[in-house]
């Protein structure tokens, strides 16, 4: 047997039936979809319907909830702040607040406030005023000789992680 002699077993591959090709084809007019209704239209799939089997979303238990007044903080890392200070876009000699951070382009929007995280190195002596910060970020800023003031309640800022 050679590669060019390979064939599917008899009946293993079924030819595709071309539908909506006239009345003589046996699948003309409605193309096997029946008459009218949602399922006869194009682009329709009944989401979550599994052919009568109990769908996955009903087999699994309900769990959790979404807090309606949840605070969403924009995250800024120390390394990024240092990069902007080095580039001259942030002035380390002046106090830096959330509006200055957004104006410099460190983050595009502040959402419910800005939360500073400790990723990266900080060498500049900064006076930061932000909504929240991680403990390691506060330690890194104070180690560099700077200070940080948190405007949001500590519990709210800590839960934003």
UniProtKB/Swiss-Prot annotation:
It holds the Pfam family Ribosomal_L27A. InterPro entries: Ribosomal_uL15, Ribosomal_uL15/eL18, Ribosomal_uL15/eL18_sf, Ribosomal_uL15_bac-type, Ribosomal_uL15_CS. Keywords: Ribonucleoprotein, Ribosomal protein, RNA-binding, rRNA-binding. The keyword Magnesium does not apply. GO terms for molecular function: rRNA binding; structural constituent of ribosome. Residues 23-35 have a biased composition (Gly residues). Residues 1-13 have a biased composition (Basic and acidic residues). SUPFAM superfamilies: Ribosomal proteins L15p and L18e. One of its GO terms (biological process) is translation. One of its GO terms (cellular component) is large ribosomal subunit. Residues 1-51 are annotated as: Disordered. The keyword rRNA-binding applies. Part of the 50S ribosomal subunit. Belongs to the universal ribosomal protein uL15 family. HAMAP family: Ribosomal_uL15 (MF_01341). NCBIfam families: rplO_bact. Binds to the 23S rRNA. This is Large ribosomal subunit protein uL15. The gene is rplO.
